[in-house]
Amino acid sequence: MSKLNKKTFFIILLLSSLVSCSTFDSLRFWSNDDDVDPDEPKELLSFNEQRNINIEWDISFNGVNDLGSFKPGFSSENLFFADAEGNLISVQSSTGKENWKKQLNFLSSGVASGFGILVVSDIKGNVIALNQNDGSEIWSTNVKGEVLSTAAIDPKTVVVKTGSGELIGLEKTSGETLWSYRSKLPTLTIRGSSSPVIFDNNVFVTFDNGRLGVFDINSGFLLWDGAISYVSGTSELDNLIDADADPVVDGGLVYTTNYQGKLNIFDIAQKRSVWSYDVSSFFSPVVSRGMIIVSESNSNIKSFSAKSLEESWSNEDYLNRELSNPASFKGNLVFGDFEGYLHVIDPLNGKTIGRKKISKKPIKTLFSRSNSLYAIDEAFNLFSVSI
């Protein structure tokens, strides 16, 4: 099983499209001014500003955040964040003032926080639990595989998923392995991984084979699963259907997306898919204000009525601008892009109502909590933002 990071994957995809062209004229790289390259990032359009964006504080870390998999953890009034070089810090979420910091080995994923502990994973396959108060190590367990996504924590169990598709339950106080499940992976996958989600004593997780699995958290027993989409191409690239987005559990339903696949809604009680729509996405959908909103892999944004499931609006203003994950914040929809902009969109009509450039680097991840929105760029700069 081979892993491609997203940048490498898109380069390969571009090269394969060039090889298929029979003449240089068909490439049209130097054609007249009336021609528009459909793969070029769309220029930003003017808009009617209704929201102001302000940076409350920012902290710079080390390394390259190319996958956007490093997310902050929270507990009470504190924020915990780590970079790829193992710098772990606790700060006051309102001011950014440092509480404590700790140096760890090179890390492969961000910080999970819950029930008095922090959990991180390093590049050697070690899952490490630390005390939230001072960063002291509680336990470390090697799971024999790199963990590329944030762990999930409940009162008794820490759940992690490795890049090789293994889901593992660890005892929260000791790190002892309680159970494991290995999914069947395709030959080629995109380097990235969704995080498990714990809800009502069950673990919901999506895999690189394009399936959703639901497990009992105590035993690791597979309760039910279903395909988000099926392969339909003739080549390995065509058959990439990685589900790198965390499932969203809301109102008895599970919302899932995958690459070159679908937005698929599963009913938990019925244990099956009840609706799907063809999309290609690396990000979890946003379910907010009666809308289901998904950012596609080409940065087109689509929305659906959560009640009727009919398509509502579509926004192509940000095509190929490498949008970050969407975040719902104070009734707004927020995205980052490859030029370091934050964009605020009205989720009811898809219109842009706010914008600000906060970084010289691409914005990779957005995370909202309480009255603050947090943005993380490719250079591991962490911004606390208010709107």
Describe every region a protein language model picked out.
Residues 83-84, 122-123, 162-163, 207-208, ...:
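Structural signature of WD-repeat beta-propellers
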Residues 294-302, 310-344:
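Loop/turn-rich, solvent-exposed surfaces of beta-rich toroidal or solenoidal domains
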Residues 2-9:
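Bacterial N-terminal signal peptides that target proteins for export
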Residues 92-95, 131-134, 171-175, 216-220, ...:
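Short loop/turn segments that connect beta-strands within beta-propeller blades
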